[in-house]
């Protein structure tokens, strides 16, 4: 039984990607999750309970954050076991972090098989973007969802969670009725830049995939 006021619906979400892509910054934006996080010493993981209020009551994503161990090689299977969904993050200002996305995806599906996954390109607030919409094709090949995000400005913060919730619950009309309390923006996402990026993504989505069958 869930405690009084505790969301009945809970999901384990694993957050993966290269070190320095902004995973911890992203998960810390959700203030109650940051306040209530727990450290799992055996795995060296912080679990942030992120609650969202929806048209079907509150739901909770228990977000597993690696606390930087990915810098020392792969993650242990214990991190992935029983994950119900995942976010793979890369940094749009660093091409190598996008090049490594297939490795993270491979590790995930090896343990978790067929779970819903969102790919997020973080740091889109930075003007010097290296990984452009047209070169982000991995999600289309593997049937993942993709979002541009900017953790420091809260831009698109809720989008990955809403998409995952709709998939997990099986209801396309599922909505968040209120935004969670987020840390104040540290940078401002330029609305014109955001609009341009959204247009670029739509255009890229409508473009045929390149023929070569490598994983990038």
Curated annotation (Swiss-Prot):
Residues 7-171 form the Small GTPase Ran-type domain. One of its GO terms (biological process) is GTP metabolic process. InterPro entries: P-loop_NTPase, Ran_GTPase, Small_GTP-bd, Small_GTPase. Residues 211-216 are annotated as: Interaction with RANBP1. It catalyses: GTP + H2O = GDP + phosphate + H(+). Mg(2+) interacts primarily with the phosphate groups of the bound guanine nucleotide. Its cofactor is Mg(2+). Its EC number is 3.6.5.-. GO terms for molecular function: GTP binding; GTPase activity; magnesium ion binding. GTP binds at residues 18-25, 36-42, 68, 122-125, 150-152. The record marks 69 as: Essential for GTP hydrolysis. GO terms for cellular component: cytosol; nuclear envelope; nucleus. Residues 68-84 are annotated as: Switch-II. SUPFAM superfamilies: P-loop containing nucleoside triphosphate hydrolases. Keywords: Cytoplasm, Developmental protein, GTP-binding, Hydrolase, Magnesium, Metal-binding, Nucleotide-binding, Nucleus, Protein transport, Transport. Residues 37-45 are annotated as: Switch-I. Belongs to the small GTPase superfamily. Ran family. GTPase involved in nucleocytoplasmic transport, participating both to the import and the export from the nucleus of proteins and RNAs. Switches between a cytoplasmic GDP- and a nuclear GTP-bound state by nucleotide exchange and GTP hydrolysis. Nuclear import receptors such as importin beta bind their substrates only in the absence of GTP-bound RAN and release them upon direct interaction with GTP-bound RAN, while export receptors behave in the opposite way. This is GTP-binding nuclear protein Ran. It comes from Xenopus tropicalis (Western clawed frog).
């Amino acid at each position: 039984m869930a405690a009084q006021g505790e969301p009945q619906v809970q999901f384990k979400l694993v957050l993966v990607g290269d070190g320095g892509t902004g995973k911890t910054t992203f998960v810390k934006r959700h203030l109650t999750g940051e306040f209530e996080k727990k450290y799992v010493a055996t795995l060296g993981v912080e679990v942030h309970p992120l609650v969202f209020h929806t048209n079907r009551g509150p739901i909770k994503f228990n977000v597993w954050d690696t606390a930087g161990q990915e810098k020392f090689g792969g993650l242990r299977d214990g991190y992935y076991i029983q994950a119900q969904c995942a976010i793979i993050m890369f940094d749009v200002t660093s091409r190598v972090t996008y090049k490594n996305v297939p490795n993270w995806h491979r590790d995930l599906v090896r343990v978790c098989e067929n779970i819903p996954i969102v790919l997020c390109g973080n740091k889109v607030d930075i003007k010097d973007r290296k990984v452009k919409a047209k070169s982000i094709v991995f999600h289309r090949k593997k049937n993942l969802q993709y979002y541009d995000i900017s953790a420091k400005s809260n831009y698109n913060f809720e989008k990955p969670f809403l998409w995952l919730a709709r998939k997990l619950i099986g209801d396309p009309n599922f909505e968040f009725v209120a935004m969670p309390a987020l840390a104040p923006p540290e940078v401002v996402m330029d609305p014109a830049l955001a609009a341009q990026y959204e247009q670029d993504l739509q255009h890229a989505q409508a473009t045929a995939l390149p023929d070569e069958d490598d994983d990038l």
